[in-house]
Amino acid sequence: MLALEAAQLDGPHFSCLYPDGVFYDLDSCKHSSYPDSEGAPDSLWDWTVAPPVPATPYEAFDPAAAAFSHPQAAQLCYEPPTYSPAGNLELAPSLEAPGPGLPAYPTENFASQTLVPPAYAPYPSPVLSEEEDLPLDSPALEVSDSESDEALVAGPEGKGSEAGTRKKLRLYQFLLGLLTRGDMRECVWWVEPGAGVFQFSSKHKELLARRWGQQKGNRKRMTYQKLARALRNYAKTGEIRKVKRKLTYQFDSALLPAVRRA
């Protein structure tokens, strides 16, 4: 009967006694690619041995002969976004070819572009009328020529009247004053003083119209056409009416006594 003995430890090597009584060396079954327990270097992976020197030496590098060019055909593809320490989302460009399904973004030279100022449509400035372009401190002037137009003139009151006393002057009053005083006889004159009929001069009627415009303080030039329109409007109130004669008009009879007293 064979006696089984325990495995014997002989140094760093192990031996095992099998039932047939033959000892087998376990080290002979160990693969040569692994280091042993003593840390011996592997024969296949010997890192301490320097690599063999190639037979042909490397050519000397000549910086002058080397020519570098900008990779024009290289396409930029963007890797997955990364977060910078400041918390901003940034895209890291890469020179690798874009993967399938990822679009390639063409490079653009922004330095060669010329910036052009944006064109804006001119904003139309408001058109100022003749009344709006007056200075703010200028006195208000009357420009209408209807029969109700009245100019402010200094009142004929005496020294005891208040300063700045003014009264309204109407067109028929202006004409009555000229006819009564005999002013501007070359422009207007009596035809029948007792009946209150008067006539304008066809030659100097515009001069009389300008005088009335100055009396009113109009900025626009007064014409006889405007003055005649105001006289026709007086027919509604009865102060003056048109006579069937060229450039001839007649005052209302109620105004004649005032003319005689003047």
Curated annotation (Swiss-Prot):
Cytoplasm found in the keyword field: yes
InterPro entries: Ets_dom, ETS_fam, WH-like_DNA-bd_sf, WH_DNA-bd_sf
GO MF entries: DNA-binding transcription activator activity, RNA polymerase II-specific; DNA-binding transcription factor activity, RNA polymerase II-specific; RNA polymerase II cis-regulatory region sequence-specific DNA binding; sequence-specific double-stranded DNA binding
Record's keyword terms, sorted: Activator, Cytoplasm, DNA-binding, Nucleus, Transcription, Transcription regulation
GO biological process, one term: positive regulation of transcription by RNA polymerase II
Role noted for this protein: Sequence specific transcriptional activator which binds to the PU-box, a purine-rich DNA sequence (5'-GAGGAA-3') that can act as a lymphoid-specific enhancer. Promotes development of plasmacytoid dendritic cells (pDCs), also known as type 2 DC precursors (pre-DC2) or natural interferon (IFN)-producing cells. These cells have the capacity to produce large amounts of interferon and block viral replication. May be required for B-cell receptor (BCR) signaling, which is necessary for normal B-cell development and antigenic stimulation.
Similarity comment: family membership: Belongs to the ETS family.
Domain notes from UniProt: The protein contains a weakly acidic N-terminal transactivation domain (TAD) followed by a second TAD rich in proline, serine and threonine. Each of these domains may be required for transcriptional activation of a subset of target genes.
Protein name (Swiss-Prot/TrEMBL): Transcription factor Spi-B
